[in-house]
């Protein structure tokens, strides 16, 4: 956890959760953005009808989760949505890289999801992604995924700047 920047180990004191830093946020989300762009492009080419149905179900689960106001449940539903796209890419190395980033991204995702004002936008982006992936519209799906992650960067950066996370 220390190597991933999630925990600070303080000699003779123990460990504490590391603060989210803007630079760290940008670094992690730049990598995520590049990997998720590739993932959505490959998913547009390879997704099966079953995976499309799973994606639709995951989007519905996300909608239901956001009504609970349980941040953990909402974050897990969002992770599951993205996992289906990643699996549909069919690229095991890509999936592995995204899974390796998951813990680092989770903190940022949680901060982002603490603001219920972002939910309608997320739901719309998920629905747009499903439509574009279903119709194999690679360029449009990539644009939506980029916007989706850029919005997260912007929202979490605002949180970092206005308060200590």
Locate the predicted segments by residue:
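Residue-level signal for the nucleotide or nucleotide-sugar donor/cofactor binding architecture
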Residues: 117, 135-136
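Mobile beta-alpha loop/short-helix "lid" or hinge segments that flank ligand
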Residues: 2-8, 101-103, 117-119
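Conserved amphipathic alpha-helical segments that form helical-bundle/coiled-coil interaction surfaces
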Residues: 28, 32, 40, 46-111, ...
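A short, acidic/glycine-rich surface segment
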Residues: 113-115
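Short linear motifs at protein or domain termini
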Residues: 1-41, 45, 87, 153, ...
């Amino acid at each position: 956890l220390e190597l991933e920047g999630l925990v600070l180990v303080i000699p003779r004191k123990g460990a504490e959760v590391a603060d989210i830093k803007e630079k760290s946020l940008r670094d992690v989300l730049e990598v995520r953005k590049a990997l998720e762009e590739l993932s959505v492009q490959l998913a547009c080419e390879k997704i099966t009808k079953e995976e499309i149905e799973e994606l639709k179900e995951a989007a519905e689960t996300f909608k239901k989760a956001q009504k609970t106001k349980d941040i953990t449940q909402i974050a897990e539903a969002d992770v599951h949505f993205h996992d289906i796209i990643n699996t549909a890419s069919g690229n095991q190395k890509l999936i592995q890289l995204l899974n390796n980033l998951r813990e680092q991204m989770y903190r940022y995702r949680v901060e982002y999801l603490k603001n219920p004002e972002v939910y309608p936008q997320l739901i719309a982006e998920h629905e747009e992604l499903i439509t574009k992936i279903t119709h194999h519209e690679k360029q449009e799906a990539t644009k939506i995924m980029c916007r989706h992650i850029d919005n997260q960067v912007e929202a979490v950066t605002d949180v970092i700047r206005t308060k200590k996370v």
